[in-house]
Amino acid sequence: MLSIAIGADSAAIDLKNTITDYLQQKGLTVTDYSYDPTGENPIYPDVAYTLAHAIKDGKHQRGILLCGTGIGMCIVANKVNGIRAAQCHDTYSAQRARKSNNAQVIALGARVIGPELAKEIIGAWLDAEFEGGGSAPKVEKIGYYEHQEKHQ
């Protein structure tokens, strides 16, 4: 069974709650990374960085990040070596994020899409699997570049 990490900033708490319920109804285990340990409102860099590291460290197989647009969360998650995050606002992009890019993290914007479309997008992403094939060398090249950056 997939273990899903979810995280949201203050702009997307309602959507996060809706998505969490949706995932739990599908029988998935969901861990929430939305809360700031200081008791302050969560800010997207902290949420995305913590969640991305939880994926990298093997605590969860997939991660869902939610903020106003999905942009900031996606940028931060992609700063963590080994993480491939994709901002998606349609089902086709979500499927391709998994099938072609092996994205372990998806980022969505609560101010861009509504809850029903968000559920469809996440469902499409969860149902898709990495195809390998011609995409495998491209994903490997991403890892190569990450390694180069780390050692410069």
Curated annotation (Swiss-Prot):
Residues annotated as the enzyme's active site: C67
GO molecular function: intramolecular oxidoreductase activity, interconverting aldoses and ketoses
Keywords assigned by UniProt, alphabetized: Carbohydrate metabolism, Isomerase
Catalytic function, reaction form: D-erythrulose 4-phosphate = D-erythrose 4-phosphate
Name of the gene encoding the protein in the UniProt record: derI
Transmembrane regions: none
Similarity field: Belongs to the LacAB/RpiB family.
Presence of the UniProt keyword rRNA processing in the record: no
Keyword Ubl conjugation among UniProt keywords: no
Name assigned to this protein: D-erythrulose-4-phosphate isomerase
Role description: Involved in catabolism of D-apiose. Catalyzes the isomerization of D-erythrulose 4-phosphate to D-erythrose 4-phosphate.
Organism: Pectobacterium atrosepticum (strain SCRI 1043 / ATCC BAA-672)
EC number: 5.3.1.34
Biological process (GO), any one: carbohydrate metabolic process
Pathway(s) it belongs to: Carbohydrate metabolism
